[in-house]
Amino acid sequence: MSRYLGPRFKIIRRLKTLPGLTSKRPKYKKRVRRRFSRPWWKKSQHLICLQEKQKIRFHYGLTERQLRQYINIAKRAQGSTGQVLLQLLEMRLDNIIFQLGIARTIPAARQIVNHRHVLVNGRVVDIPSYRCKPQDVLTIKTKNPEELRTIINKNRSKFRRKVPYHLTLDLAQNKGIVNKIIDRKDIQLKIQEMLVIEYYC
């Protein structure tokens, strides 16, 4: 299955807030609720698991095949499979660029990486799925450092986005540092990761 390139509001209305997919917010129409009305259908367990799986896919911009690969890696690792899965996804290079505030969304961060604007420990890395490790130093290649600082400050203030505790942003030198692997409590995406694992069992 290829990466989703269709309308993003359609996904947001169905799965609710996914900050990695889009920074915009759709307008919801107010529905008039009748006094004795009841929902005519109930969500099955399979549907709930499917929606949680789709949240991860669309938030991080993964294909079905990529997500399966991450789940297989998480199953072989020590610890909670769901927590390891989220940590693997959060430590992707495109997600780190997004979390630092350099890009508005993860697709925008992926484009920055693909265009070879990112250096990891002094080397150009153009693979968005590159797994960052503790003590990695990320630098952005730019001809106008002042403009980059303005973009970062604008993204952080407009979307009220704080740099997570596992990262450090040095605006003076236009670089970010990965301090450690992210903790589960610091992950911003509202997700029930064990339902995703259950979906693939």
Curated annotation (Swiss-Prot):
Q: Which GO terms describe its biological process?
A: ribosomal small subunit biogenesis; translation
Write down the superkingdom of origin: Eukaryota
Enumerate the subcellular locations listed in this protein's record, separating them with semicolons: Plastid, Chloroplast
Please list the residue ranges annotated as the S4 RNA-binding domain: 91-151
Among the Pfam families in the record, one is S4
Q: What is this protein called?
A: Small ribosomal subunit protein uS4c
Q: Of which family is this protein a member?
A: Belongs to the universal ribosomal protein uS4 family.
One GO molecular-function entry = structural constituent of ribosome
- Gene3D superfamilies per UniProt: Ribosomal Protein S4 Delta 41, Chain A, domain 1, RNA-binding S4 domain
Summarizing the function annotation, the protein's role is:
One of the primary rRNA binding proteins, it binds directly to 16S rRNA where it nucleates assembly of the body of the 30S subunit. With S5 and S12 plays an important role in translational accuracy.
Q: What is its main location?
A: plastid
Q: Name the HAMAP family for this protein.
A: Ribosomal_uS4_B
* Organism the protein comes from: Welwitschia mirabilis (Tree tumbo)
InterPro entries membership: Ribosomal_uS4, Ribosomal_uS4_bac-type, Ribosomal_uS4_N, S4_RNA-bd, S4_RNA-bd_sf
UniProt keyword list:
Chloroplast, Plastid, Ribonucleoprotein, Ribosomal protein, RNA-binding, rRNA-binding
Q: How does it assemble?
A: Part of the 30S ribosomal subunit. Contacts protein S5. The interaction surface between S4 and S5 is involved in control of translational fidelity.
Q: Name one GO cellular component term.
A: small ribosomal subunit
